[in-house]
Amino acid sequence: MPKIGMEPLRRRELIDAAIRTIGQRGSLDVTVAQIAHEAGVSPALAHHYFGGKDKLILATMRHLLRELGRDLNAAIKQANAPHERIAAIIAVNFSAAQFAQETIAAWLTFYVHAQQSDDIKRLLRIYARRLHSNLVFALEQLTSRARANRIAEGAGAMIDGLYIRHALGADAPDAASAIALVEDYIAIQLSGQPSAEN
């Protein structure tokens, strides 16, 4: 039997191991045994805590979303103006915790498998709605609601696109460049200038 009080630690170790294993393989075609081995625990213990691979995968996604939400809430509390709020949202999406090579690969894998999994698709839609609503809340203090929605849609697509680009690249993720690209896009849109250079 698992030791009393060890469950939260073991669950977190298994979730972290799932991120690494999925990220390394670039696929959800992993087994509980492989994840358990990566975590240094027995497959039986992994099954005890999660009940199977599908539940472990969903728990991993929920964990990433919870971490993102927690970090975002903390960053937004420090923002005193709309521009600061926008900067905080962008920065958190490219933070070291989220924009690490294995985490990026895991996110990309989740997007691919959302086509076959309603549960994964639902979680990704929740993420997209939260990102959009957070951006719109700040942007509509600087422009019309219709324009805020359009800019937020573009910024969200850009963030997703940068994750995909870095997942396919061999170089280490460059968070500073990614943040600058999204911030520049939003600044250009708010200024009313065309998004492409003449």
Swiss-Prot record:
Q: Does the keyword Secreted apply?
A: no
Q: Where is the HTH tetR-type domain?
A: 8-68
> What biological-process terms (Gene Ontology) are attached?
glycine betaine biosynthetic process from choline; negative regulation of DNA-templated transcription
The answer to whether keyword Transcription regulation applies is yes
**Keywords associated with the record:** DNA-binding, Repressor, Transcription, Transcription regulation
Pathway(s) of this molecule: Amine and polyamine biosynthesis; betaine biosynthesis via choline pathway [regulation]
A Pfam family cross-referenced in the UniProt record is TetR_C_6
Where does the record locate the signal sequence feature? none
MF terms from GO for this chain are:
DNA-binding transcription factor activity; transcription cis-regulatory region binding
User: In which residue ranges does the UniProt entry place its DNA-binding region annotation?
Assistant: 31-50
PANTHER family per the UniProt record, alphabetical = HTH-TYPE TRANSCRIPTIONAL REGULATOR BETI, HTH-TYPE TRANSCRIPTIONAL REGULATOR RUTR
Could you tell me which NCBIfam families the record lists for this protein?
betaine_BetI, PRK00767.1
User: What is the stated purpose of this protein?
Assistant: Repressor involved in the biosynthesis of the osmoprotectant glycine betaine. It represses transcription of the choline transporter BetT and the genes of BetAB involved in the synthesis of glycine betaine.
Q: What is this protein called?
A: HTH-type transcriptional regulator BetI
Organism, scientific name? Brucella suis biovar 1 (strain 1330)
